[in-house]
Amino acid sequence: MGDVHESISEQMADWMAAQPMFFVGSAPLSGDGRVNISPKGMAGTFAVLGPRRVAYLDYTGSGAETIAHLRENGRIVVMFCAFEGAPNIVRLHGRGRIVLPGDESFDQLRASFPKERTLGQRSIIDVDVQRISDSCGYAVPLMDFTADRVVLDRSAERRDEEYFERYGQEQNATSIDGLPALPPR
């Protein structure tokens, strides 16, 4: 049986920080729109900003579903699972907002993340957490963490800002359902 919490405790924040990956879920308002779940990783890209506020650093990817869904309706869930140690699942349901490079609060939020690479960062997803819950996770498999993948970092090293700007406008301007994602710059 799961528990609902009033706030993110220090113990919960430490546990989330120790997980090598998390998942982000979002959906459009349309009943025939596609639900999206994205795995997220890379050390230093998630931050607990307060007892009911979290954020993650969003790098350029093949799609922009979460951004499109947040622009349309703001709904988001962030989920962590224990793949090592005691079983546990934490879900953070809330309302998210997209903070783009150049936005007034971007630099202040960016300082919350230890991840140093800035090339290819597309946004920060800032979440006002409305429901915090945990559950057993007894069916989540045990897996050994080997290392963070470095493919995205190495790929970014071969690019420049113009590449990411062009890619964002050509590949991340809309969701797979045609919702607006990254705004023109």
Q: What is each of the regions a protein language model found here?
A:
Residues 1-185:
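Binding-site signature for planar aromatic cofactors or substrates
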